[in-house]
């Protein structure tokens, strides 16, 4: 894992949370309903056992609903969803949002891509295939010059999805 990005994700900590790595406070989160991620790459000590502590306060807070005794039960508290470590390369695709637009038998595929970590001579390649079929069709490849990129491709011979003949497509985005 040395030389890689280590991203610690806590999917649910109700309600106030403080995160400690090897005794050092590395962050906090004030919402029991949303996941949060912290980059621990610089805090991890390689070759020894590292310690993660999550301190959670589940008492009612005026800043996190429900409050004001508007519900007739005690809300849950503590870590109620997964905690996991995601290991990434130094530069990686952080977000890929794909949306499609169908017009007749051709479609338009628009992807908003966010990369993290930077670097030189990087490119993003995108390809598509129908689910259940082998082999992708290359849509294109584009140089990544910053952290954000929008790709816009036309895809021919698209079959629409419907309840009688469901057709699913798989899009692969590579850095």
Where are these regions (language model features)?
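Accessory beta-strand-rich segments of carbohydrate-active enzymes
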Residues: 1-95, 118
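Short coil/turn motif common to extracellular beta-sandwich-like domains
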Residues: 2-7, 104-112
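Short glycine/proline/serine/threonine-rich loop/turn segments at secondary-structure transition edges
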Residues: 4, 44-49, 155-170
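Conserved aromatic beta-strand anchor motif in extracellular beta-sandwich/beta-rich domains
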Residues: 19-23, 126-132, 175
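Short strand-edge motifs at loop-to-beta-strand transitions and within beta-strands
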Residues: 34-38, 147-153
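Extracellular recognition modules
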Residues: 53-55, 170-174
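Short beta-strand segments of immunoglobulin-like
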Residues: 96-103
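Beta-strand-rich binding/interaction modules
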Residues: 106-143, 149-151
